[in-house]
């Protein structure tokens, strides 16, 4: 009965088979597979971080070990194959999201400030689920290299993207 088990992820598990989006595939929205079957971070990086943060909140509230294990698999994928040394994520400028494993270009890095904020949020929630210094390390890296560096000193302006290498002649294109 609806409302007895308030987990949107379970209620919505059959969604997606008939979905057709003119502009974005299901991967963009992380809706290509049920979350428990996802093993690779795909699609829009900020959306993924919000989804994974929500999954972590649900795992914490419900004690769902399968959900936590799925999160650990996604965590490993993001932090070992799709994260820059600066803690930035989302290397693909087309779709503002994840690319293939180890595709981390310095000059074309999208690496949104928002994605670093999302990564920090997800890492904090993972740390609440499991005392593991890896989560705290990623929080620190994201905070100092992706969040604070994405804001002006007065806090009134932000960098949208944070590439590791910039060609001054092409800055206006981004």
Predicted segments, located by residue:
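Glycan-recognition and catalytic cores of secretory/periplasmic carbohydrate-active enzymes
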Residues: 1-174
């Amino acid at each position: 009965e609806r409302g007895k088990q308030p987990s949107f992820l379970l209620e919505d598990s059959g969604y997606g088979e008939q979905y057709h989006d003119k502009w974005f595939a299901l991967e963009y929205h992380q809706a290509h597979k049920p979350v428990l079957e996802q093993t690779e971070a795909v699609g829009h990086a900020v959306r993924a971080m919000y989804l994974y943060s929500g999954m972590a909140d649900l795992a914490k509230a419900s004690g769902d070990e399968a959900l936590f294990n799925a999160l650990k698999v996604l965590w490993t994928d993001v932090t070992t194959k799709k994260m820059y040394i600066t803690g930035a994520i989302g290397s693909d400028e087309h779709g503002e999201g994840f690319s293939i494993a180890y595709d981390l270009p310095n000059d074309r890095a999208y690496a949104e400030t928002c994605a670093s904020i999302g990564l920090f949020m997800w890492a904090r929630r993972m740390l609440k689920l499991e005392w593991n210094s890896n989560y705290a390390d990623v929080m620190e890296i994201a905070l100092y290299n992706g969040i604070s560096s994405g804001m002006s000193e007065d806090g009134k302006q932000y960098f949208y993207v944070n590439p590791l290498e910039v060609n001054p002649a092409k800055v206006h294109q981004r």
